[in-house]
Amino acid sequence: MPLSVYVESLGCSKNLIDAEVMLGILNQYGYKLTNNEVKADVIIVNTCGFIEAAKEESINKIIELGQLKKDKLKLLIVAGCLGERYQKDLLEELPEVDAIVGTGGYHEIVKVIHQTMKGQRIVEIGDINRPYDETLPRIQTTASHSAYIKISDGCDNYCTYCIIPKLRGKYRSRKMENIIQEAQTLANNGVKEIILIAQDTTRYGIDLYDEYRLSALLDKLSEVEGIQWIRILYCYPEMITDELIATIKNNDKVCKYIDIPIQHCSTKILKLMNRRTSKEEIVSLIEKLKKNVPNIVIRTSIIVGFPGESEEDFNELKAFIEDIKFDRLGVFTYSQEEGTPAAQLAEQVPSELKESRQKILMELQQRISLNKNRLYIGQSIEVLIEEEIAEKTEYLGRSQGDAPEIDGIVYVKSTVPLCVGQIVKVKIENALEYDLMGEGIHESSK
């Protein structure tokens, strides 16, 4: 009888794809996949080790699932960034863990299970710079109508606060034809929205083709029959070209949405972070985006409490956010991570002050977001239906301006039944801080 396996994926969408590949490999080798951890013989926890909060979440989940060894569970395997980061130390600190699989070793998951079933406790790290293996299968775990596509792995940016290059290796683009093929397979399975992800999507192609190819990739993806929305996440501001802006503007399938994690606006702090841009360049880029794509939704993320961030720097950041009025904003407190240059900087900001600054900016953004959402009242927008919440009358969905998990939702009332995965026109009638409410317009659905 085949072993049953449960995979728990923590952290970002890029990590989720690694988990989906492990599921594909296990399925290919005849393992029984289960969504119920209590019924599993083997549990794989695909961990995040990016910042302190993510490490704590991963450790807590490992300990929680380790309790199942009192019952049916035979093996507990830790994969992903936490395993890559701490390797043998993790195995020594957590006796309930049977094996560690690094970010360069998940393709060996079957071998790891075989060896641990023989009583060995092993560490399978692998090569974090290995080329992307296009032959590995993948089982999609997101909603059937929406899927992530990882267009590269690794990172060459070396921001001083970030451990990712040490966990994921150098930047490695996938071949364009393989990405197109994956998109077509997803479309054949009913996917309507694809979300392009990487540590840096704007760098796509430079290592393979000696030029940036994100715009060309978007144009090719838009030719895939069945795909209706193409969304781009994780764009570095200094890499957003006029060509990319023109593609977002002119390609009907590319969502009028862009995610640009700027991290700060103070040129002093940006230099300390080793970010290759300045406040003036960020402002110029945002003005160019708004001018060329008038209805574009801009998401960004900010780090507060970076070492050396003075009250003056923070006030500059606050004024910047008030002035720019981002459509979507995530604010994170700086996490002092061992092995990063920023961890050695003087003037580390106290935790209480970091949290206070985060709260101030999120309250500011809440007001900005509400005012922006109110502008949608009376407008008709396209909404991708994601869930039925009241039988045949009320639904949850997302607009082109909302990425899954991180952005808002649209509450939709309908006089006719709608299907999950359907894109419908919705007239917006009310607005909340982050969400919209509206009524379906049924003569134009697809």
UniProtKB/Swiss-Prot annotation:
| Cofactor(s) demanded | [4Fe-4S] cluster
Task: Tell me which residues bind [4Fe-4S] cluster 1.
Answer: C12, C48, C81
This entry's comment on the bound cofactor is: Binds 2 [4Fe-4S] clusters. One cluster is coordinated with 3 cysteines and an exchangeable S-adenosyl-L-methionine.
Radical SAM core domain: residues covered: 141-371
Q: GO molecular-function annotation terms? A: 4 iron, 4 sulfur cluster binding; aspartic acid methylthiotransferase activity; metal ion binding; protein methylthiotransferase activity
- Which Pfam families has this protein been placed in? Radical_SAM (PF04055), TRAM_2 (PF18693), UPF0004 (PF00919)
Catalytic activity reported? L-aspartate(89)-[ribosomal protein uS12]-hydrogen + (sulfur carrier)-SH + AH2 + 2 S-adenosyl-L-methionine = 3-methylsulfanyl-L-aspartate(89)-[ribosomal protein uS12]-hydrogen + (sulfur carrier)-H + 5'-deoxyadenosine + L-methionine + A + S-adenosyl-L-homocysteine + 2 H(+)
- A GO biological process held by the record: tRNA modification
Q: Outline the extent of the TRAM domain.
A: 374-442
Q: Where is it located?
A: Cytoplasm
Q: Name one GO cellular component term.
A: cytosol
Q: Which family does it belong to?
A: Belongs to the methylthiotransferase family. RimO subfamily.
What is the official name of this protein in its record? Ribosomal protein uS12 methylthiotransferase RimO
Native source species: Alkaliphilus metalliredigens (strain QYMF)
